[in-house]
Amino acid sequence: MKTHKNHLRLLILLLLVLLACAGYMTVGVHFENQKLFAYAMRIRTPKLIAMLITAFSIGSASIVFQSIINNTIVTPCLLGMDQLYSLIHTAVFFVAGSGSFLAVNANAAFAVDLAIMGAVATVIYSYLFRKTNHNVLYVLLIGTVLTSFFSSIQTTLTRVMDPNEYDTLLTDLVASFSNVNSAILVLSVAVLVLVAFALRKELALLDVLTLGKDQAINLGVDYDRCIRRLLLGVTLYIATATAMVGPLAFLGLIIANLSRQFLSTYRHSQLITGSVLFGMAVLIGGQLLMERVFVYSVPVSVFITVGGGVYFLYLLLTQRKA
């Protein structure tokens, strides 16, 4: 009975997302003018696809990460990918300037971001995980230290940077769906699909892994290998989303916990689906609000940061009372 209720809730969420998509694609469009209509569709379609891809990558990665760490108020941003993204772009502007190839070419910037973050994720969260005897808490601590390290270097560079370059850099460090093109979208989808395919066996074992290490091993699961591969997959998913649109630190916290509270189940297939759908609704709704109400004066990341901060405090207070 509970499974049927959750399926119904997921269906309602899906309908809300479809309505949000339809609203985003049609609000303010001049249907009577063929050229204006075609122009609006050409501008909005890549943005919508980017929001759907971002919601999928962050939503699924957040649920998996929380299950690995066994804590529902942590987010994958603790792995340091957001700060590494900021450091990469700050270094490019500091060394080569705002007129350099990497600063003006979105495709090249995406490729470099993804390559560096993917390499860092592979070296740190695969190699060091083995070196720490497969202790996820050590890995979480390493991620927190790296976040502070990347942030300190980035802050130092911005303090000695030319003010004009810094002003241009600020717009590049804010999450935006405006500079996404078809080449970036295709490459992002390819990366996400390849990672999901490579981890299909581990993803199927998530329900067992959350029982605990001893129980999972007793059931025949290679626990350490599964956790290591899933952690690497989470990092690559977050790296892909961050390289595509920029850092969205609180989004994972919001949508993962909304999914857990809305569905009240331990089935990861349903939790991940709910998290992805909530992510789509939040991003599309926020983008629509930013474009139509605030007329591009406030980026969507501000809404997510403010809402995520308030929601985080709510989670802390409610869990403390519980």
Predicted regions mapped to residue ranges:
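Alpha-helical transmembrane segments in inner-membrane proteins
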Residues: 1-322
